[in-house]
Regions:
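Long, positively charged amphipathic alpha-helical accessory segments at protein N-termini or as interdomain linkers
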Residues: 2-6, 69-93, 103-175
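Conserved active-site carboxylates
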Residues: 100
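N-terminal lobe of the biotin/lipoate ligase/transferase fold
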Residues: 1-88, 160
Length: 175
């Protein structure tokens, strides 16, 4: 991550419409670069092409305000941090272009970068990351079952914590 980004400050909320939308709504003074917002549940999570992102309880719904030197590389940067984190846990993840992170052929999560410009100048960039952490197949809508997975389903670890997962992701993003 570029040295233009300070260490991250994580704020956790129980529920919100969308973590990306919230960071984009806030004045920059209230959400400077390095601000991170984690929701334990989202009511209007979005993915690529404005598709609805299932935000079932037990997922990590995280957005981070950044000041990147190259906003076009944010999706790859966010996915790479998640892949590195999975590797540190002994899990083999892959990137399904352009923004999905997969394990064993099933979608674990995704990244959604949003850049806002004022004229030709980058005003702000938000990186949204959604990861299925605690969900079982029964927690997902019937049409997604068999196509998605979660950390708890893919790991021999018996204990997972969404906030700790977000903190570890932010550390991976810093490196």
């Amino acid at each position: 991550m570029s040295s233009a980004n300070p260490p991250f400050t994580l704020r956790v909320v129980e529920q919100i419409d969308s973590t990306n939308a919230e960071l984009l709504r806030l004045p920059l003074e209230q959400a400077p670069p390095g601000s991170a917002l984690l929701a334990l549940r989202q009511s209007q999570g979005r993915g690529r092409s404005d598709r609805r992102w299932e935000s079932a309880p037990g997922g990590m719904y995280l957005s981070v305000m950044l000041r990147p030197s190259c906003p076009q590389g944010l999706a790859l940067l966010g996915a790479r941090a998640l892949l590195d984190l999975l590797d540190s846990w002994g899990m083999q993840g892959t990137l399904r272009w352009p923004n999905d992170v997969m394990i064993a052929g099933r979608k674990l999560g995704g990244v959604l970068p949003v850049a806002r410009y004022q004229g030709n100048s980058l005003e702000r960039a938000v990186l949204g990351v959604g990861v299925n952490v605690l969900q079982t197949q029964a927690d997902f809508p019937a049409e997604l079952r068999g196509h998605v997975t979660s950390l708890v389903q893919q790991s021999p670890r018996s204990q997972w914590d969404v906030v700790e997962t977000a903190q570890r992701y932010l550390r991976a993003l810093e490196t």
